[in-house]
Amino acid sequence: DFEKSLSLQGDSGPYLQYTYARCRSILGKARSTNFEIRNNVELSKEELDLLRTIYKFPEVVQEAAEKYAPNLVCNFVFDLAQLYNNFYNTHSVLQADTEEQKHFRLLLTSAVAQLIQNSLSLLGIQTLEKM
């Protein structure tokens, strides 16, 4: 289905590209890459869900390689994108309540962008900085 494959919603390449471009845009607006977290930051459910998913990436890549199953990387990156978009729609990154929270969310956004880029690279797909 041509329309589904070009959709910015759900399981599609453009959806992943859009999520990556969104992350890069947020990081560009931050105008800094030197984020420091000095105090403990209280994490939301959405942030914890993202951290748990990020933690699984090396295992997913290893399993995908051992089983010759690139679909495992596809499933991972779609799940990651959905979790990030849910987080983004629930919490402000650049307008967080505290500087520590803002810095944590920027670091989280940077990690998500890197994992989307790494996942797509493993699948032979280049990322787009803007859409």
Report each predicted region and the residues it spans.
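Non-catalytic interaction-recognition regions
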Residues: 1-131
